């Protein structure tokens, strides 16, 4: 009998380091101002004080050529999506704080560099390695994982747009990056006809069946819709139907933003027009193929569709999500179809919506069982309407978040709504940054109800 261990998926549980980067004076000012406004909510004030600097102090590393590596947390890799979200609460400081501007600009430089390395990968290594060497085809040495997630491309443009709006400049010429993104998206509008992308993971290395794609790595059967095909969701789970509506919503928004950017910054009307045309195709595809009638909730957005008459009616905590559509800029928070969709996904009609003794909210297939994700609770607060009921919802959600940290003072990936001391991923920087962003965005609402 062989003495070699049986093949198994990699396990990662990197401990959170002590703070390794000093806060800037502007960051101290933000923390002081928020704490003063939340003097009547000490739990939430403490939570913000620990979450706001978490990405800055524990996940960032300076690289050559002005680039910045952003570790996701207890997994030692950089996700394009996570890294953009992790630095999101610092963007408002970029105009006046040179160190924050340099660091966030370095994140964008690194993202553009990684896209050039492999535009189909979702996560990358700090140094050459091959953690998932068993995937088919095998990823390159700088690639942590090569799951094609449409929102990865969107996140780079999202960060570029917001940095440009905050500072009036960018650390690179964005046009080659945008051209590469357009090339991939246009190809994936006709995945079966034009794309060479495949992804398979041997069963013995899959944590969940959704770690691989069906049909020999091509994903589920589908027909062209104008939307962009995505193999995987932002949860890193395979799509059931390969037109992921929230990711396409994100794409429709960031492509129009990118068009404005390249037109105003570079005077490039041709590239801007190409991005706008793709954005229009995607939006038309969403509104034609990504909407269906629900017997209880009426006209709603589906989470996924295949262009063949099938719709998956659910939502997942990870962003982009249907819940996040107004946050992404796709629609207003009072849009009728969005409100119908919101009612659906915040009910037991969504298989990932859970109600427990201590919390109610959306979870993910990525964490099977009754688990709620703080990211979803934050997004619910960020997209609540500016009405008395909506403001009360915001306050209740943030109070829930402050009470369900298991005494750690930080956000986690997920927790049991009946026993919040049971949670996953003690160091998950994306969730910490989104909590900070939620408090900053909703501070007037929270403070008025102290």
Located regions from the model:
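Low-complexity, Ser/Thr/Pro/Gly-enriched N-terminal "stalk/linker" regions
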Residues: 2-81
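Long, acidic, intrinsically disordered low-complexity segments
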Residues: 12-45, 98-103, 181-183, 192-206, ...
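Well-ordered alpha-helical scaffold segments within catalytic/enzyme domains
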Residues: 26-40, 85-98, 155-170, 249-268, ...
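Extended, well-ordered alpha-helical scaffold segments
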Residues: 47, 98-114, 169-188, 258, ...
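A short glycine/serine-rich beta->alpha loop
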Residues: 70-77, 140-146, 240, 310-312, ...
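Aromatic-rich carbohydrate-recognition surfaces in CAZymes
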Residues: 76-104, 108-209, 429-443
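Extended ligand-binding clefts on enzyme/binding-domain cores
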Residues: 80, 116-120, 124-127, 131, ...
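C-terminal capping/lid segments that line or modulate ligand- or cofactor-binding pockets
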Residues: 135-141, 146-149, 312-332, 370-450
């Amino acid at each position: 009998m062989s003495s070699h261990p049986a093949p198994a998926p990699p396990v990662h549980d990197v401990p959170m380091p002590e703070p390794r980067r000093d806060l800037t004076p502007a960051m101290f000012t933000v923390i002081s101002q928020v704490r003063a406004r939340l003097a009547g909510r000490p739990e939430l004030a403490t939570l913000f004080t620990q979450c706001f600097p978490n990405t800055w102090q524990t996940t960032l590393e300076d690289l050559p050529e002005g680039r910045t590596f952003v570790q996701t947390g207890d997994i030692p890799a950089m996700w394009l999506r996570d890294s953009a979200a992790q630095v999101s609460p610092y963007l408002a400081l970029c105009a006046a704080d040179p160190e924050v501007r340099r660091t966030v600009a370095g994140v964008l430089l690194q993202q553009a560099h990684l896209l050039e390395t492999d535009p189909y990968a979702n996560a990358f290594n700090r140094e050459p390695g091959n953690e998932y060497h068993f995937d088919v085809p095998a990823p390159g040495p700088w690639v942590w994982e090569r799951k094609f997630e449409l929102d990865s491309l969107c996140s780079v443009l999202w960060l570029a747009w917001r940095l440009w709006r905050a500072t009036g400049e960018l650390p690179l010429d964005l046009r080659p990056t945008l051209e590469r993104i357009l090339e991939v998206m246009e190809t994936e509008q006709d995945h079966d006809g034009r794309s060479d992308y495949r992804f398979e993971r041997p069963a013995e290395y899959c944590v969940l069946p959704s770690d691989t794609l069906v049909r020999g790595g091509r994903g589920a059967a589908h027909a062209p819709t104008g939307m962009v095909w995505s193999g995987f969701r932002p949860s890193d789970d395979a799509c059931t139907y390969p037109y992921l509506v929230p990711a396409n919503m994100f794409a429709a928004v960031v492509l129009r933003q990118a068009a404005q950017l390249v037109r105003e910054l570079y005077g490039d009307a041709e590239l801007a027009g190409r991005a706008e045309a793709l954005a229009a195709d995607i939006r038309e595809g969403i509104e034609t193929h990504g909407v269906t009638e629900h017997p209880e909730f009426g006209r709603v957005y589906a989470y996924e569709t295949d262009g063949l008459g099938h719709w998956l009616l659910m939502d997942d905590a990870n962003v982009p999500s249907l819940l996040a559509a107004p946050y992404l800029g796709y629609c207003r928070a009072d849009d009728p179809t969005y409100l119908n969709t919101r009612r659906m996904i915040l009910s037991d009609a969504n298989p990932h919506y859970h109600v427990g003794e201590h919390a109610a909210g959306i979870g993910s297939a990525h964490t099977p069982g009754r688990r709620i994700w703080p990211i979803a609770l934050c997004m619910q607060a960020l997209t609540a309407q500016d009405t008395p009921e909506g403001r009360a919802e915001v306050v209740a959600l943030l109070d829930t978040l402050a009470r369900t940290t298991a005494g750690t003072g930080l956000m986690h990936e997920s927790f049991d709504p009946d026993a919040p001391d049971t949670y996953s991923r003690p160091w998950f920087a994306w969730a910490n940054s989104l909590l900070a962003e939620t408090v900053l965005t909703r501070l007037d609402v929270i403070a008025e109800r102290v």
